[in-house]
């Protein structure tokens, strides 16, 4: 049995030479043509629609998307030519070699970008951001470099350390798990030494043998105590069927390892835990096992972990459910080369990145910029438990890769069958990976009107059509659905939904940390906190943060005959500086916040802006205060909303490798706050989505997206002269007389399709699922592309 089957708990990553994938390897890789990597449906023009994609041309280059294939090759070769770096090709490397971890575009400075986007300057010079890991020493470390300008030119291109975007002052992070394979081997050695006990307690073994039925997974992040490095590990039952359910099959048997240094002969087991009891040594554990009065046994796989249909079928469920169609074809345009999209009067660019996945840029309405940048920064899952492994677990998911975890979307299920699909590409370990059809674009009818009103003589209603950009990232046991939606009224929502297997803990009779949800399974409590950056530019870069608050008052009015009237009023104030901008949502939702421009009042004297507020589901910040596991690595998680003055030296609230040294992170969000003014400055918002998740029986086998959802909306506030949704023709007004007979019907030019619709167009295409396409970059082999299963 493979040690690291589908369990994100395992800290071993590609940095240590072992990649913990949420899937077993697929079949042997086969040659693949990129020609069919992106799904573009086209049908005959008979019937309602040709479904032909609307191709458009972006007004400018997409200066935000990652490196081109040629740039990846050039930068890789350039770095290998720098003898002082002493790099080894990844395909030939060991855990003691220096390697290239990843390459991406170093995002342009905002001033340079806006100068180009507004037509006043040249395209910003392109620079690569190179993440290198130096393993050829006793203390391995990651160092970020900047390489450029691109393309590579002899005598012009240079490389240097990338330090200015890190609050620590340097882009260097110590790595304590570089010897991932050695750690895995050590843990299997421990499993072998106590296999007599695991057979007795768990009826299984984890020794590295083919007939193992247990596996071992470790806590993340590693535990730093003084100058020592520790990790808790737990034995899990291996799945016995088709479903990778290990994270709900804990055994409670855990051991703590001191893995300080790089010499495995000096590593040692320094503690054992089982079913609420602790022993400081293996000898004490062996002795204590003999006197155990309770031996509950492990959680075992079975039909309860299956996600297939089971149980009695629902009434009338044999009938095909409603579906959405686009009878006249897509109503949005796409420039695939530039990843540029237009829908109604919205336009924007998208980019995709290994750590953070989908990002939106230069979002405009009728050509006027609303948002410079909008995208995920980090996703945290922080656990709590009476057992040491879960008490030590706080996952920062960009370290695993939100972008690397975006896979082919399931047509008709992840997205409507009429959706348009885009590919994503990223670079890791000297190979580019193409994930076909991993972003989808589509319109849908929300099923309720965006506007409606009825009177004694008429009723009016307007369709609520929404345009959505969606991706799904499977990070270990959890699947995150990320989507950005655009609305007729000029508002934008970002939504995160979660599904997949929970990470359960062993039930030892204590309900303080979760419900008892299966035989020996506790629904281990945890917080999901998902951080986003939102850089609004309201009629320019100079903005302020307005707070409006409903407050109860008792007031005497000229008309109240001297009596106090108990009522309420609105208080307006501005958040004047960064130190006052760490915001927790007000009780009862009485306070609201908006980015406004005080220098460009509308004709009524009000400051135009966009306000931000929770939309659906729950929002959350971290419950734990001064987390022992996180140290200073996730200070962005402590409140709901933040406002900061923009600086090119502070491009992100988080860093993908903060979890390697959480008490000394390269990016400490708390250091962004230094009292700077927020009065008519270039303001950047950071906000958190998420939920406090206390899993119950409804989370088995998988959590469902109906309850695991969090959403934020930004909407115009005194920005436009009225409701923008009045511009759509897809509305109706019915006038009726005193006898309630309709005398007039206004449909404002809407033409109802009357053609026959071919239902085959709406049938999900489930035969084209592609895992990923890998293209080696060093040595460069453009004809050596391979198609593999996800994680294969």
Regions of interest found by a model, annotated:
Residues 1-24, 29:
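Fungal secretory targeting signals
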């Amino acid at each position: 049995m493979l040690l690291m089957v589908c369990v994100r708990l395992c800290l071993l990553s590609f940095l240590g030479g072992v990649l913990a994938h949420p899937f077993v390897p697929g079949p042997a890789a086969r040659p693949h043509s990129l020609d069919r990597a992106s799904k573009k449906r086209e049908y005959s023009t008979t019937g309602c629609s040709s479904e032909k994609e609307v191709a458009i041309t972006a007004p400018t280059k997409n200066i935000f998307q990652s490196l081109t294939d040629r740039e990846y090759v050039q930068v890789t070769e350039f770095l290998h030519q720098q003898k002082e770096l002493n790099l080894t090709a990844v395909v030939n490397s060991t855990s003691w070699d220096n390697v290239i971890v990843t390459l991406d575009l170093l995002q342009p400075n905002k001033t340079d970008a806006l100068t180009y986007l507004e037509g006043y300057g040249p395209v910003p010079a392109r620079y690569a951001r190179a993440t290198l890991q130096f393993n050829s020493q006793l203390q391995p470390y990651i160092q970020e470099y900047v390489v450029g300008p691109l393309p590579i030119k002899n005598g012009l291109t240079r490389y240097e350390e990338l330090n200015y975007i890190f609050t620590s002052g340097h882009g260097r992070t110590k790595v304590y798990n570089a010897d991932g394979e050695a750690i895995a081997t050590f843990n299997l050695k421990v499993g072998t030494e106590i296999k007599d006990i695991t057979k007795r307690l768990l009826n299984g073994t984890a020794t590295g043998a083919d007939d193992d039925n247990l596996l071992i997974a470790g806590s993340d992040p590693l535990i730093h105590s003084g100058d020592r490095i520790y990790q808790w590990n737990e034995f899990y039952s291996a799945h016995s069927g088709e479903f990778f359910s290990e994270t709900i099959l804990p055994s409670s048997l855990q051991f703590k390892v001191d893995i300080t240094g790089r010499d495995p002969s000096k590593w040692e087991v320094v503690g054992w835990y089982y079913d609420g009891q602790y022993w400081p040594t293996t000898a004490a554990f062996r002795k204590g096992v003999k006197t155990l009065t309770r031996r509950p046994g492990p959680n075992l796989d079975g039909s309860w972990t299956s996600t297939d249909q089971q149980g009695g079928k629902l009434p009338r469920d044999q009938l095909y459910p409603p579906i959405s169609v686009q009878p006249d074809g897509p109503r949005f345009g796409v420039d695939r080369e530039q990843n540029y999209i237009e829908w109604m009067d919205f336009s924007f660019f998208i980019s995709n990145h290994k750590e953070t996945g989908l990002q939106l840029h230069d979002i405009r309405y009728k050509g006027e910029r609303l948002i410079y940048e909008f995208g995920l920064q980090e996703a945290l899952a922080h656990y709590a438990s009476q057992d040491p492994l879960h008490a030590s677990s706080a996952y920062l998911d960009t370290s695993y890769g939100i972008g690397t975890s975006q896979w082919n979307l399931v047509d008709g299920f992840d997205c409507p069958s009429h959706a348009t699909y885009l590919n994503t590409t990223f670079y890791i370990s000297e190979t580019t990976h193409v994930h076909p059809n991993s972003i989808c674009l589509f319109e849908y009818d929300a099923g309720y009107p965006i506007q409606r009103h009825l009177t004694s003589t008429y009723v009016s209603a307007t369709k609520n059509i929404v345009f959505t950009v969606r991706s799904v990232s499977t990070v270990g046991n959890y699947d995150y659905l990320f989507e950005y939606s655009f609305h007729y009224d000029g508002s934008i929502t970002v939504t995160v939904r979660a599904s997949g297997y929970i990470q359960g803990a062993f039930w030892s009779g204590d309900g303080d940390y979760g419900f008892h949800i299966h035989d020996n399974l506790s629904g281990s409590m945890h917080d999901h906190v998902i951080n986003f950056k939102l850089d609004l530019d309201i009629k320019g870069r100079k903005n302020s943060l307005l707070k409006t608050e409903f407050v109860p008052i008792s007031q005497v009015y000229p008309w109240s005959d001297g009596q106090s009237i108990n009522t309420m009023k609105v208080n307006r104030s501005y958040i004047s500086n960064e130190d006052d901008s760490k915001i927790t949502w007000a009780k009862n939702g009485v306070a609201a916040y908006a980015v406004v421009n005080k220098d460009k009042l509308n004709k009524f004297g009000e400051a135009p802006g966009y306000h931000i507020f929770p939309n659906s589901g729950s929002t959350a910040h971290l419950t734990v205060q001064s987390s022992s596991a996180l140290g200073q690595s996730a200070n962005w998680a402590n409140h709901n909303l933040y406002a900061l003055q923009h600086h090119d030296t502070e491009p992100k609230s988080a860093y993908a490798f903060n979890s390697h040294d959480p008490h000394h992170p390269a990016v400490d969000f708390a250091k962004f706050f230094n009292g700077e003014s927020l009065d008519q400055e270039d303001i950047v918002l950071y906000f958190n989505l998420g939920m406090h998740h206390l899993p119950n029986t409804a989370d088995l086998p998988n959590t469902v997206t109906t309850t695991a959802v969090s959403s934020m909306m930004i909407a115009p506030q005194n920005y436009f002269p009225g409701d923008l949704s009045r511009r759509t023709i897809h509305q109706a007004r019915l006038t009726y007389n005193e006898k309630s007979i309709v005398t007039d019907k206004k449909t404002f030019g809407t033409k109802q399709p009357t053609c026959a619709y071919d239902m085959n167009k709406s049938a999900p295409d489930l035969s084209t699922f592609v895992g990923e396409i890998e293209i080696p970059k060093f040595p460069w082999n453009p004809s050596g592309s391979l198609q593999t299963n996800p994680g294969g």
